[in-house]
């Protein structure tokens, strides 16, 4: 299925890097928002998102800007091209806006734009067990867990506002059930990473790279065991093999 139950997906992004930045100045989202507002009022275009994060590297004059965003409407070559063009236009515009209106950016230069669009969400597998937001936020542990997640839900639904962040129970982590990786209707078809069967809130936590590694490992082990056994493996066998391979379950 495409996106969530309403057919919505999270915004895609393309970071860019600036050099020559005085990182002793305020690099907060609030400072970015102030600069973007001034740029918009001055008539600058291709600035849809009001703010974003500037990631600094201590002791350097380099920042990575996480601002340009676009809402995917499919994965055709035409649509991917449209998004790439739009995001690169945004990156150039945001770099110019920050240079002109944000203190500390007066001598900044655009040195790099990400090599390709970052897609947070597209199609998902319809699985046998749905991971829920409550499972994630409460740090639920379960006997059928085959991977762990610890990233808090990070929801990028708006093209104009910054992401919404929800806190996982402090000091905790949550299990991802084997059924969230298994197709509801097709034998020995598994999905991992952004394919995991999860509701909107849970998906915003499991789509990140570290958790994708864990679910990919689990899906591969489960599918291989099923191919060897000729039948669906029990979760205990999958967990045991993952632990044998030093997986954290």
Model-assigned labels for residue ranges:
Residues 1-249:
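Flavin (FAD/FMN)-binding glycine-rich loop and adjacent Rossmann-like elements that form
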